């Protein structure tokens, strides 16, 4: 009887140990399954986020204009926030680009006006005169008459007319009354010259970016503004008898 009691006690202890092992194993399996589910959910959310980001990135690339179009709605121009949602806003951007293109052309006239009229820069006048004479000689060679005496008379008359011209008199007076500028005046003039070299290029490249939006409204604003500005600048140069400088490569 005592043996049976001991045997029953051993059986009870083994059953309790087995149940403890089983419960521990099930707990470990539950933790592993929970970890796997969390990992899968996080990977799924990250993949979905990447997919959405890729779709947004692709849609932004698809929205870029690759040819001339009349569509302008919510399309950025040069800056991120410079865009038009209505026709009135598009017209406002048109006026802005027209004014910038016009001003870029007029700055060339301002530079020539300051050098020749305001500052009376003799070196600038001589360089511009040499460029204009050289281009004139390349384009139209002198025509010789039948008689040498007549040709000499024509050349002498032209030289006399040039000497008696008001531009020649102003240049001669400026050379005779030329005074050395102070250091402050020289530095201030050089700063203005530097600004008149940088600002037109800044406007030109900004207008190029605006034209590269391939929007007809903004494209014609740049073209018309630049053309009108060039026309007005040339008319003012003729009015003030300012010599034209060499043509600029940029718009």
Curated annotation (Swiss-Prot):
Keyword Membrane listed? The answer is yes
Membrane topology value = Multi-pass membrane protein
**Basic and acidic residues composition-biased segments:** 157-173
Q: Which GO terms describe its biological process?
A: copper ion import; copper ion transport; iron ion transmembrane transport
PANTHER family noted in UniProt: COPPER TRANSPORT PROTEIN CTR1, SOLUTE CARRIER FAMILY 31 COPPER TRANSPORTERS
Q: State the protein's purpose.
A: Required for high affinity copper (probably reduced Cu I) transport into the cell.
User: Under which name does UniProt file this protein?
Assistant: Copper transport protein CTR1
Lineage of origin: Eukaryota, Fungi, Dikarya, Ascomycota, Saccharomycotina
In the UniProt record, the gene name given for this protein reads CTR1
């Amino acid at each position: 009887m005592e043996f049976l009691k001991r045997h029953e006690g051993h059986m009870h202890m083994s059953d309790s140990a087995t149940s403890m092992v089983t419960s521990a194993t099930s707990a470990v399996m539950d933790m592993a399954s929970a970890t796997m589910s969390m990992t899968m959910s996080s990977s799924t959310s990250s993949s979905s986020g990447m997919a959405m980001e890729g779709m947004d990135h692709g849609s932004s690339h698809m929205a870029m204009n690759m040819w001339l179009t009349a569509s302008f709605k919510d399309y950025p121009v040069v800056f991120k926030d410079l865009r038009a949602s209505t026709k009135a806003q598009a017209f406002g951007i048109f006026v802005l680009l027209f004014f910038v293109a016009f001003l870029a052309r007029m700055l060339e006239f301002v530079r020539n006006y300051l050098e020749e009229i305001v500052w009376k820069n003799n070196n600038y006048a001589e360089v511009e005169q040499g460029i204009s004479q050289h281009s004139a000689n390349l384009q139209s060679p002198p025509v010789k008459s039948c008689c040498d005496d007549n040709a000499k008379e024509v050349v002498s008359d032209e030289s006399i007319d040039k000497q008696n011209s008001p531009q020649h008199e102003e240049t001669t007076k400026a050379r005779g009354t030329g005074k050395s500028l102070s250091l402050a005046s020289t530095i201030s003039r050089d700063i203005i010259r530097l600004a008149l070299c940088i600002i037109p290029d800044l406007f030109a490249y900004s207008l190029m970016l605006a034209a590269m939006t391939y929007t007809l409204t903004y494209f014609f604003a740049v073209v018309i503004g630049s053309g009108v500005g060039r026309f007005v600048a040339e008319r003012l140069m003729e009015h003030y008898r300012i010599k034209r400088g060499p043509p600029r490569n940029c718009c």
